[in-house]
Swiss-Prot record:
The gene is ABD1. Residues 1-17, 25-53, 69-90 have a biased composition (Polar residues). Belongs to the class I-like SAM-binding methyltransferase superfamily. mRNA cap 0 methyltransferase family. Residues 271-579 form the mRNA cap 0 methyltransferase domain. Residues 191-214 have a biased composition (Acidic residues). The keyword Transcription regulation does not apply. Keywords: Methyltransferase, mRNA capping, mRNA processing, Nucleus, RNA-binding, S-adenosyl-L-methionine, Transferase. This is mRNA cap guanine-N(7) methyltransferase. MRNA binds at N280, N281. It comes from Meyerozyma guilliermondii (strain ATCC 6260 / CBS 566 / DSM 6381 / JCM 1539 / NBRC 10279 / NRRL Y-324). It is found in: Nucleus.
Length: 580
């Protein structure tokens, strides 16, 4: 490194990635007037020599923390007074259950309770009094659902519930005052780094087709994950009788099996898509880092709702953006269980305030409270999923600052009804000015492949490479525009991650138009390569060193290359804002 006698100045990164104009051309790091060492963070020094980046890291001193008693019956929300077990809920008298949670005993499906009752009164018999619904959760109903909603007498809902509500919800109100400051900018390395960009997924026998949605469950009594083996085994799912199962059963079975097998696969660094996963994770850090907005009200916490949280791969990102509360929901019960255990293993023990100064966040730990539930956000309302085990949570923590749906929203495009339920949950959960951030397959990328007839040899309905493939169940339209926009299925394969699971095309303009109908306006949309190219100079020194090193190309530069580049180009990132 050439020394500078005129003083030390900060190193600047002028190019770390390959732009679209340069194609696969290698990128470089340039420096100007630098001293031998430039301090980037409190625990990291960076040296720049001959446009090559070299990082030396000084480990901080370990913080003493009290060991957790393994015999303690931990709850899903560590140190959080919002947990309630299924047994406790079932022991409550029927009067304590909110009316919107009730279901008819003989209901054939989850929507029967919204069908108007047949009037079997005898002539002259007085009609049962109908009253207004609980106004706290009415906003989660679409207008057509509200018109058909069963109404019940006041005393059935308001009696005991009103008496117990203050002590339940006050706990959440108190938590809203407990925000923390001084969030460090660097993404920390938790005990278990993210395991990829997909939600993961249980045994085939436990997920028969056409079952009802899985109820929310607490996970304090479930076993922890087993240790991985030394050798790596590529993932393969085994879903019997797949052609006769609905999309929910297939997705749940796939990601349940993915969760179980991932514990025995071996070191994730040996995965054939290790670099691709790191690239996708880096893009998610950039999206959330740019678009999670703090609550403008003084003293209010930053709350994130992850509507398809998988195994908790985005918990590190919640810490990265300085979240105070995190709510994770997923259709796979095995994934939710794993997410809870990941959070519990890496949860920080809060540093007490000293002399009126707020304690620094430990970026290697989760300095936020979290709760997890199993449910289908594309068919159930958020209160239906959360309130059975966390009474008062919707009124206490909502509306939230950010709703995140990563690599999973395309499953909702099976039907218009599922999309509208999903968007209704998003819009009603967000505060004005809050953001909806997500990643989906790019309909523009799919259309270009179809129009250019860029199919695999011998096929007219399949494209991809050795890492990924997209196979339509029928020949796609020659112009690449799908009509109608819902239910256009294809099987997606990603080596060591997704094993030919049915997905659906998301025509982005249709999606954008439906978002506008619920008060969400588009603020950002770019494909993954564009996001990485634009944001990596800003985030290079903020991201965890292992994550950055995991994106190193064969030529020593950073970014996606070869088959990985095409695979990540399949996706785009977006951000919508909730209008006030």
């Amino acid at each position: 490194m050439s020394g500078s006698k005129q003083g030390s100045e900060k190193a600047s990164i002028t190019s770390l990635i390959d732009s679209e104009e340069q194609g696969d051309e290698a990128t470089s790091v340039s420096t100007q007037n630098q001293s031998p060492k430039t301090q980037i963070t409190q625990t990291e020094n960076v040296e720049v020599q001959n446009s090559d980046l070299k990082v030396t890291e000084n480990k901080p001193k370990n913080t003493e923390m009290k060991p957790t008693d393994p015999n303690t019956n931990a709850s899903t929300t560590e140190n959080t007074p919002i947990t309630t077990s299924n047994a406790q809920v079932s022991e409550k008298s029927e009067k304590t259950v909110p009316a919107w949670m009730r279901e008819p005993e003989e209901a054939q499906n989850r929507y029967d309770r919204y069908v108007p009752r047949v009037d079997n009164r005898r002539r002259g018999e007085p009609r049962v009094a109908e009253v207004r619904q609980d106004p706290r959760y009415a906003k989660y109903l679409r207008q057509d659902q509200e018109e058909r909603r069963i109404r019940r007498p006041d005393d059935e809902y308001e009696g005991d519930h009103k008496r117990r509500r203050p002590e339940m919800v006050t706990q959440f109100d108190d938590r809203r005052q407990g925000t923390r400051k001084n969030h460090p900018g660097q993404a920390g390395q938790s005990e278990s780094e993210e395991n990829g960009d997909e939600q993961q997924g249980d045994d085939e026998e436990e997920t028969p087709g056409n079952e009802e949605p899985v109820e929310a469950q607490p996970y304090s009594r479930l076993a922890t994950s087993v240790q991985s083996t030394q050798h790596y085994h590529t993932f393969q799912s085994h879903i019997a009788n797949k052609e006769n199962k609905d999309i929910n059963s297939i997705v749940r079975s796939h990601y349940n099996q993915r969760t179980i097998q991932s514990k025995m696969q071996g070191s994730r660094t040996k995965s054939p898509i290790y670099k691709l996963r790191n690239f996708n994770n880096a893009v998610k850090y950039m999206l959330l880092g740019n678009h999670v907005r703090k609550n403008p009200n003084p003293g209010s916490p930053t709350v994130i709702l992850d509507m398809c949280c998988g195994k908790g791969g985005d918990l590190n990102k919640a810490e990265f953006v300085g979240a105070d509360q995190y709510v994770g929901i997923d259709i796979s019960d095995a994934s939710v269980k794993e997410a809870f255990h990941r959070y519990r293993r890496n949860k920080a023990r809060f540093i007490p305030r000293d002399g009126g100064r707020a304690g620094q966040r430990d970026s290697r730990k989760y300095n936020f409270e979290a709760c997890f539930a199993t449910g289908d956000c594309f068919q159930q309302s958020i209160p239906e999923i959360l309130e059975p085990n966390f009474p008062g949570i919707v009124n206490g923590l909502f509306p939230v600052d950010c709703v995140s749906i990563q690599f999973s929203m395309h499953y909702s495009f099976e039907s218009e009804e599922r999309v509208r339920t999903m968007l209704n949950n998003v819009s009603k959960s967000l505060r004005p000015g809050g953001t909806f951030v997500g990643t989906i397959p790019s309909s523009d990328f799919i259309r270009d492949k179809i129009v250019n007839k860029d199919f695999l040899p011998g096929t007219n309905n399949k494209f991809g490479n050795e890492l990924y493939s997209v196979t339509f169940d029928r020949t796609p339209p020659s112009d690449g525009i799908f009509r109608p926009p819902f239910g256009n299925k294809y099987d997606y394969f990603l080596k060591d991650a997704v094993d030919n699971v049915p997905e659906y095309v998301v025509p982005f303009e249709v999606f954008r138009s439906m978002c506008e109908e619920v008060g969400l306006t588009l603020r950002y949309k770019k494909n993954f390569i564009e996001i990485f190219n634009q944001e990596i100079p800003k985030y290079f020194h903020k991201l965890n060193r292992n994550l950055v090193d995991g994106m190193k190309r064969a030529d020593g530069k950073y970014g996606a290359e070869g088959a990985e580049k095409e695979a990540v180009s399949f996706y785009l990132g977006f951000a919508f804002e909730k209008l006030g």
